[in-house]
UniProtKB/Swiss-Prot annotation:
Free-text note regarding domains: The DBINO region is involved in binding to DNA.
Domain Helicase C-terminal: 1433-1591
Entry protein name: Chromatin-remodeling ATPase INO80
Any one GO cellular component localisation term in the record: Ino80 complex
Assigned keywords, A-Z: Activator, ATP-binding, DNA damage, DNA repair, DNA-binding, Hydrolase, Nucleotide-binding, Nucleus, Phosphoprotein, Transcription, Transcription regulation
Source species: Schizosaccharomyces pombe (strain 972 / ATCC 24843)
Protein localization: Nucleus
SMART domains in UniProt: DEXDc (SM00487), HELICc (SM00490)
SUPFAM superfamilies referenced in this protein's UniProt entry, alphabetically: P-loop containing nucleoside triphosphate hydrolases
Length: 1604
């Protein structure tokens, strides 16, 4: 089997088959540098299909490559091939020069087709083998491919005519030219044609082989029609027509006829054979031709000398000859084109067939030879390497098994030695014990026989010495015997170890001998064999070291170890020396026998190694079977394992050596290390001791703190119990004191009888509420009340020292049974009539209020006038000032502080009601206020009727800014309008006003309690600081019970509530509208619930997902100012979503990106009265049409000398025209009754008039458009040709209105689409047409551009005609004229109305019609309304209110929402006004006046904080709260701007609430605050509501967010 046909997995490779064109695409070419085909490496076998021809798609412009398998190359101007892969172009000469000799004979057949192959004489069999070739059309080798010859383009260029070479190679022409023999042409035409080339057309839809401007298209060297017909190239037919035409396409040509046809001359101007030679010479000089140039048939061809005539003109009277000549011209040109195409296609097919055959033979043979050479070398090296690796692996496995057996035997021998040593030790101990016993017995015998005679002793001793051995001798012999036994066992063990080591050596030798190849030849030196040798050397060295260690050799033992032998061992050796000498013979014999056995085993091992391996073939057979399984996977893996093991062994050995060295040097550092260890241990012990004592102290401290905490808790509970009892008694004291105060004030007791001295009265702080008795506390309360009355009277006397007071002894009792503040406590004290200087009539309840205020002033007591909004608090306050001026001659100074929006109202009402009081409006800039202060800020100023001022009106902001100036004046009366502005006792405003010097203070507020009871205490302390001194205690007393009642509907103590009312009654007067004003109807409040729109839901859910519960709880616990601000910000974001999503982000105006250019601006002032501004917008993209395509009748075909438009004009519109006058006359004369033109006599028209009408281009155009709408299709084709295939698809996606132009509305019949129908049904059709023109597009394009400009380079005629067609004044009137102009022409000009009018648009409009669809996308206001649920409801509500003549006040919390509402009102065309915090004071006055006096104003937009205080807007009868305020009192004041005195209509209040959002919780919270007011002011019961925190702090808002 051929190894080159085997793959690595053992499967057979498929035989080579020449690939087709599709498989060859994208392959690499031959790489001659490495002498390896197709750019592959030596071990890479992925080259079974080596292909080097690459198909290039850039040879054809704007179209895919042709489907042929091989394509022709491109050639540049210098004749070299132009290709993207020139870097990898095959050098066949170099390739052939490097082919080995053994393949020269096989390769010589291919070298005939390689250029310069004869230049290699050094290669045998390769030189002089090029077969003879036949010349073809180009006199080149017929069987070769031009791409294989580097010099072929130059040679071909030299042999082609200059005019033809321009079309073929686009190179610089050369003057020399050779003719082509007919034999070469016939032989070339007889070559076979590839099947794929014959079946596939060479020319596709988008590529013209004869287009001069398609430079990338391949051209043939035959004559092209573009060359024959190009007048600018000055092609001379007599030079190249008959000489260079291929015989296949060269019929017999009449020189005169060809001259006539090619130059386009009429027959009347043909030259005769007898023409003069001078005329011919003149023509040759004119056209720069050689004088001796002749054709093959020796016929002289001369060009025409007369001017060229248009083919449409009639140049001769002989119409028949003219027609024949033109037909011959047309037919011959068609015949010439067909012949040329056939020759070109045949030549192309022949070249492609030659290229395919050459490629197949070269590639197939080269691959086969290379495969054989590569496969033999690869298999030789690869197989030997695999076998060697397997041998090494088997040897390694066997060595590992041998080493494992050795280790096992070694362990067994060590165990035997240990057992023998133990037995020997036991025997020695026993011998010593027996020897000691015998010695004792001998000693006893000596002592017993001491008294015997010496003779007997001597005899006995001599006998004993002769017959029995001595006991010492016996002892020595036993020791020697045991020692010899142990030595024998050691010798046996060492002999076994020697045998094992010899076996290892024999195994290594056998493994080494196994590395020899089976055929006896040594393997070549490869990296694999070198690695195996080094590995073997290391393994043998390791085995020798192991055997030496096992045998116990002492040669490798260091000398130092010998010196360290202990003295005990030396003594033992000396003791057993005698035993060793006696048993040396036995041990020597044993050693000799052991050596003999070892030598015998070595001999056997050597014999085994040297003997021939009988199982060698069997092993090799097994190896061949295993090789295919483990060659790819096992060998690399095992090799990696071996490498890793070797690395691990070396690493372990290195670490072991390092550890040994460290241990050897340890004794040198023993002292230092011990010291360090001692210090470390001491530190650790000290640290642990400290930790223990700290832990102990911490536990003791915790226990102590726990005990202290428990004690504090017990004490705190006891203190709370005592404090609760103390507070209860203190509250009772305060109530009693206030009741007595009210009683004293009402009865007007005498000072001498009832009021004690101040020295006998104790202060509240000095009273001990824990130990004092009830009687003592009551007595102290009486004294405190009397003292308070005395202080109040003394304070008023400071201002009345110089005035005479008229005492009034009338008194009244308290009305303790009433639970309201409608009847003042000081009633019946004295009656006050309405002042005469007051220029209005007070109502009954207003007169009662004046009496109450006058009595408070007389007693020096401050009060709170808390009438409901709209009951005339301002008039009552002004009447008090008039009363003081008229009755007591107190003309001031009076100070009125009011919100900024009501300052003008105060000034106007004071001037109108009391003209005698001079009022100074104190507001404006810093400079203005400085000037105003000169009038009232004076020292020692007296106030009477002639004083420069009496009343100063200013705002809260200015009072705080200029507090130093106001504090320098002693004010008789200070009136605070909308006193809820000082509800916070911690504000700087409250503190500044409290420091003013004034006799009396009057607070005007419609809501004395807005949120909590703490605000009520702030007002009470402001008017009576001596009674209501403790803020915390007041809040603790009243907030706990009343607010909990409003929160959870608990039961109130009625008695305590009555006493609380008694506290407030002396200082507060409050009336409601329903009780005192019967003519003012009640207001109707409605809640309008709105749903979130889809856009609002998305934003609301997004905000909810961003909230972190953990952060909210943490912020609720902290409760700082920053925390409250951040939580408030979150709540406001939710409220923005409920109002309108555009509060986050407005929708911008969008328009597509304009990809166009414009001309520079025109100076209009220089153009005079008439300015012509043409359409000058241009696209960045321009499309070039080849001149030949334009002139040959392409997309924009126009009549010309060399186009077919002249034939169409002549034959189709003139000769073959049924409207010809001659044909019409003949038809009428031949058949007057049955002629199709018999109707002419009825319309009184002549055939000539009919022919002129037909020749009108407009009539032709309308006829075609009416019949088949071909014009519209042509326009679409042009658009698709310029923009691409997706243009029509994009237009289908758009919802575009139909253009309303003249074409659509004008017609000739009285149908629904005729102009007369539309003119008579204008009212019916106007609405529908308006909807169509205003229709928006569904799809918004990202970019827009004008149509792509088309131009033809080199043709001025195209540019002129194109601009004339688009800019012509007559045609532009019909193409782009608007509808209005056409209607005017129809109505005013009857002549124009008779003309035929086009029914459909001729061209798309360049601009945008008036009122039609625009690309500029302005946000839709309808969508703006639909995006908000509230705005949608408001839109419907305003329509109803407008229809019923209502006027509306709309309140907002956010000024940005007011901005959006202004856009909505402008869109709906509602007249409105706007007032917010940014409005100036003067503007507010003017807007209020304008609203009250202009009934056409429909809506008043106000902010709740700025426009809800103090102004009178009774002209409105409807109030709408777009979003509710946190404070219900603010909303109540805002709705009372319309529901007040002077309102004649029913007031309706609408409150918009978004369902299921945070707004619902805000409204519930506001209702609970209203319940607090209801309890405190009117004493009514409340309905049960959801339990919530009334403090209004961060925890309340956190609870709302958690519910979200």
């Amino acid at each position: 089997m051929d190894p080159s046909r085997e793959t690595f997995d053992g499967s057979t490779r498929d035989s080579y088959k020449p690939p087709n064109g599709a498989e060859m695409m994208g392959q690499s070419e031959l790489n001659t540098q490495n002498r390896i085909p197709y750019n592959t490496s030596a071990n890479n076998r992925n080259w079974q299909i080596p292909l080097y021809w690459q198909q290039r798609g850039n040879e054809f412009q704007a179209s895919p490559p042709p489907p042929l398998g091989y394509v022709t190359p491109e050639y540049g101007a210098t004749g070299t091939p132009v290709n993207a892969n020139n870097a990898s172009r095959v050098d066949y000469a170099t390739t052939a020069a490097n082919v080995p000799e053994e393949y020269a004979n096989d390769y010589s057949s291919e070298l005939a087709y390689i250029h310069n192959v004869n230049d290699m004489p050094h290669v045998d069999g390769l030189s002089n083998h090029s077969p003879a070739t036949q010349p073809d059309l180009f006199e080149t080798p017929a069987q070769s491919d031009p791409i294989l010859f580097s010099s072929y383009p130059h040679a071909a260029q030299a042999r082609v005519d200059p005019s033809i070479s321009k079309d073929l190679y686009n190179m610089v022409p050369r003057p020399d030219a050779n003719t082509v023999s007919p034999h070469a042409a016939r032989s070339a035409s007889s070559l076979p044609v590839p099947k794929e080339a014959s079946e596939t057309p060479f020319r596709d839809a988008s590529t013209d082989l004869f287009d001069e401007h398609a430079h990338a298209a391949p051209m043939h060297s035959s004559i092209s029609i573009s060359t024959l017909l190009s007048d600018s190239d000055r092609y001379e037919p007599h030079v190249s027509l008959t000489e260079n035409i291929s015989p296949v396409m060269a019929p017999s040509i009449d020189a005169r006829l060809s001259q006539t046809i090619l130059r386009g001359l009429p027959p009347a101007q043909k030259l005769s054979p007898n023409s003069s030679q001078s005329q011919i010479t003149h023509n040759r000089r004119k056209h720069k031709l050689p004088l001796n140039a002749t054709t093959n048939n020796s016929v002289v061809l001369t060009p025409d000398t007369s001017p060229l005539l248009d083919s449409d003109e009639v140049v001769s009277d002989d119409d028949s000859n003219e027609q024949q000549t033109m037909m011959m011209k047309f037919n011959y040109l068609q015949h010439l084109r067909n012949k040329r195409d056939e020759a070109v296609h045949a030549e192309k097919r022949r070249l492609l067939d030659i290229r395919g055959s050459i490629h197949d033979r070269l590639v197939c043979r080269y691959e086969n030879r290379y495969n054989k050479l590569h496969a033999s070398e690869y298999n030789h090296h690869h197989d030997w390497a695999v076998r060697q690796a397997i041998r090494e692996e088997v040897a390694a496995v066997e060595a590992a098994k041998i080493r494992a057996d050795e280790e096992k035997k070694k362990k067994e021998r060590e165990e035997q030695v240990r057992l023998l040593q133990e037995s020997a030790d036991k025997d020695a101990e026993m011998n010593e014990a027996s020897t000691a016993t015998s010695e004792n017995e001998d000693l006893k015998d000596d002592l017993s026989l001491a008294d015997l005679s010496s003779k007997k002793t001597a005899n006995s001793q001599a006998t004993e010495n002769n017959n029995t051995p001595s006991k010492a001798k016996v002892k020595a012999e036993s020791k020697v015997r045991s020692k010899a036994k142990s030595d024998k066992s050691r010798a046996k063990l060492s002999s076994d170890t020697n045998k094992d080591s010899e076996k290892n050596d024999n195994n290594d030798a056998s493994l080494q001998s196994a590395g020899v190849a089976s055929d006896g030849e040594s393997s070549p030196e490869t990296p694999l064999t070198k690695a195996s040798k080094s590995k073997k050397a290391k393994a043998s060295k390791l085995a020798n070291d192991t055997s030496k260690n096992a045998n116990g050799e002492t040669k490798s033992t260091p000398k130092k170890s010998k010196k360290k032998t202990s003295k005990a061992q030396q003594e033992a050796n000396s003791t057993t020396a005698e035993g060793k000498e006696k048993l040396s013979g036995d041990s020597t014999e044993t050693g000799n026998s052991t050596n003999k056995e070892a030598s015998t085993e070595d001999t056997k091992a050597n014999a085994t190694a040297s003997a021939p391996n009988k199982k060698k073939k069997t092993v090799e057979t097994l190896q061949q079977q295993v090789i295919k399984e483990i060659a790819r996977k096992e060998i690399p893996r095992v090799y990696k394992i071996i490498q890793q093991n070797q690395y691990n062994r070396s690493t372990n050995a290195r670490k072991t050596s390092q550890l040994c060295g460290r241990e050897a040097r340890r004794w040198q550092f023993r002292t230092i290390k011990n010291n360090k260890d001692m210090q470390t241990k001491a530190k650790r012990a000290m640290r642990e001791t400290m930790v223990f004592w700290k832990r102990n102290e911490r536990v003791e401290r915790d226990l102590r703190k726990k005990a202290e905490r428990e004690a504090l808790d017990r004490a705190k509970k006891e203190e709370e119990l005592r404090e609760s009892r103390r507070q209860a008694r203190k509250l009772d004291f305060l109530i009693t004191q206030t009741e007595l105060y009210s009683h004293f004030v009402g009865r007007k007791m005498d000072r001498e009888q009832d009021l004690p001295s101040a020295t006998n009265t104790a202060s509240v702080s000095e009273i001990n509420f824990d130990s004092d008795e009830e009687e003592d506390i009551r007595r102290l309360a009486v004294e405190s009340a009397q003292e308070a009355v005395q202080k109040a009277r003394e304070h008023s006397q400071l201002f009345d020292a110089n005035r005479q007071q008229s005492p009034n002894n009338s008194s009244s009792d308290m009305n303790e049974g009433e639970m309201n503040f409608q009847n003042p406590t000081l009633v019946n004290a004295f009656e006050v009539k309405q002042p005469k200087m007051l220029m209005c009539k007070l109502k009954e309840y207003q007169l009662k209020g004046l009496n109450w205020l006058a009595n408070l002033y007389e007693q020096g007591i401050n009060g709170i006038l808390a009438d409901e909004m709209g009951l005339g608090k301002t008039v009552q306050s002004i009447s008090v000032m008039a009363y003081l001026a008229e009755t007591h001659n107190i003309w001031g100074p009076f100070l009125v502080i009011a919100p900024a929006s009501t300052l003008h109202n105060w000034q106007q009402e004071i001037t109108r009601f009391v003209p005698k009081l001079k009022c100074i409006p104190y507001w404006g800039s810093t400079k203005d206020r400085k000037i105003l202060r000169k009038f009232w800020c004076r020292k020692n100023m007296t106030y009477d009727e002639n004083s420069p001022f009496h009343v100063v009106v200013t705002s809260y902001q200015l009072v705080v800014l200029d507090a130093q100036y106001f504090q320098s004046v002693k004010w008789q009366y200070m009136i605070l309008d909308e006193a809820q502005a000082i509800k916070s006792s911690s504000s700087s405003r409250w503190k500044s006003l409290l420091a003013f010097k004034c006799r009396n203070r009057l607070l005007l507020t419609g809501t004395p309690i807005q949120n909590t009871m703490q605000e009520l205490w702030a007002l009470l302390h402001f008017i009576m600081p001596s009674l209501f001194d403790s803020h915390n205690e007041f809040s603790e007393w009243f907030s706990k019970d009343i607010e909990s009642h409003a929160q959870s509907n608990t039961q109130l103590n009625e008695q305590q509530l009555k006493r609380l009312h008694m506290i407030l009654k002396p200082f507060m007067l409050r009336r409601v509208k329903k009780n005192v004003q019967s003519e003012l109807g009640e207001k109707i409040e409605k809640e309008v619930y709105c749903d979130l729109t889809q856009r609002q839901k998305i934003l609301y859910q997004a905000l909810r997902r961003q909230i972190s519960i953990a952060e909210l709880l943490e912020k609720a616990i902290l409760g700082g100012d920053d925390t409250v601000a951040s939580i408030m910000n979150l709540v406001m974001q939710f409220r923005k979503v409920c109002n309108h999503p555009d509060l986050f982000e407005r929708e911008d105006v969008r328009s597509p990106l304009s990809l166009a250019t414009w001309s520079k601006s025109i100076y209009i002032n220089r153009e005079g009265n008439f300015l012509d501004v043409p359409y000058n917008t241009r696209n960045f993209i321009t499309f070039s049409i080849p001149r030949l395509l334009y002139e040959q009748g392409g997309i924009l075909s126009v009549p010309g000398l060399n186009t077919s438009r002249g034939f169409e004009t002549k034959y189709l519109y003139n000769l073959m025209n049924i409207w010809n006058p001659e044909y019409t006359n003949d038809s009428i004369k031949s058949n007057p009754e049955g002629s199709p033109f018999s109707w002419l006599r009825f319309v009184d028209e002549s055939p000539q008039t009919l022919f002129q009408t037909f020749q009108n281009p407009v009539v032709h155009y309308l006829d075609e458009a009416e019949a088949s709408s071909s014009l519209k299709e042509e326009q679409l084709c042009r658009q698709e040709f310029c923009y691409g295939k997706d243009y029509s698809n994009v237009r289908k996606m758009l919802l575009l209105p139909k253009s309303i132009t003249k074409v659509d509305v004008l017609g000739s019949d009285f149908k629904e689409d005729s102009p007369f129908y539309h003119l008579t049904h204008v009212l019916e059709e106007s609405d529908s047409q308006l909807d169509l023109t205003l229709l928006d597009s569904v799809l918004v394009q990202r970019a827009s551009a004008p149509p792509i400009d088309i131009y033809c380079p080199g043709s001025r005629q195209f540019t002129v005609l194109q601009s004339r067609f688009q800019r012509d004044h007559l045609w532009s009137h019909y193409l782009y004229q608007p509808l209005k102009g056409e209607e005017d022409l129809i109505i005013n000009n009857q002549a124009v109305s008779k003309l035929p009018i086009p029914r459909k648009p001729l061209l798309p409009s360049f601009g945008i019609a008036k009122g039609s669809y625009s690309n500029v996308r302005i946000p839709s206001m309808l969508r703006f309304i639909a995006d908000s649920g509230k705005l949608s409801k408001l839109d419907k509500l305003l329509v109803e209110l407008k229809a019923n003549d209502h006027r509306v006040l709309i309140y907002f919390q956010m000024t940005r929402m007011i901005d959006l509402m202004e856009e909505y009102l402008t869109f709906r065309q509602y007249k409105y006004l706007r007032l917010d915090g940014s409005s100036k004071i003067s503007q507010r006055r003017d807007m209020v006046t304008e609203w009250q006096t202009r009934p056409e104003l429909f809506v008043f937009l106000l902010s709740t904080r700025a426009g809800g205080l103090g102004i009178n807007l009774t002209a409105a009868d409807t109030v709408i709260f777009y979003d509710s305020d946190w404070n219900p009192s603010i909303d109540s004041q805002a709705m009372d701007r319309a529901h007040r005195i002077g309102q004649q209509k029913q007031v309706t209040v609408y409150r918009f609430i978004t369902r299921g959002t945070i707004e619902e919780r805000i409204v519930i919270r506001a209702k609970e605050k209203e319940e607090v007011q209801k309890v405190v002011i009117s004493g009514g019961e409340t309905r049960p509501t959801k339990q919530m925190d009334l403090k209004g702090n961060s925890r309340e808002m956190v609870s709302w967010l958690l519910e979200e």
